[in-house]
Amino acid sequence: MPRILVIDDEQLLRSTVVTILTRAEFSVEEASDGRAGIAMFHKNPPDIVLTDIFMPNRDGIEIIKELKHSSPRTKIIAMTGGGHLRMMEIAAAAQVLGADHVLDKPFDSESLLAAINAVLGSLPPPKNQVGA
């Protein structure tokens, strides 16, 4: 089962995303800011990181830079709100840095799950374990 780390400082949005992903039978962990999210990532790297862009204690752009530098194969979905033009600028910056997908807030559960499934389709197959 793919593991997802959700990093967002907005508690209500984070809880909603965690609920949607848990109901879809994903294993989910959550962090309330960038610093906590990076620490959780390094402790137990997930398959996918779903991160807000605008947060205290390390924003999403910093998270994308660090995680792609330390773990280039990590799949990252960036979430952001804002005006349309601003969203396009942020999406372009996030993708240049290595985000695999960008979700514009607010989004519905179908859009969230479609983004997760699109990113899952690009995950490498699991390594075969000898003797398993």
Language-model segment annotations:
Residues 8, 52:
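Active-site residues of response regulator receiver
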Residues 11-29:
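Two-component/phosphorelay signaling modules centered on CheY-like receiver
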Residues 32-36, 59-62:
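Acidic catalytic/metal-coordinating carboxylates
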Residues 39, 61-73:
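Short amphipathic alpha-helix used as the core "switch/output" element in two-component signaling
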Residues 44-50:
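Active-site beta3 strand of CheY-like receiver
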Residues 55:
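Receiver (REC) domain active-site loop signature in two-component systems and cognate sites
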Residues 62, 83-103, 110, 114:
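Alpha4 helix (beta4-alpha4-beta5 surface) of REC/receiver domains from two-component response regulators
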Residues 79-81:
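Hydrophobic/aromatic residues positioned on beta-strands within the core alpha/beta folds
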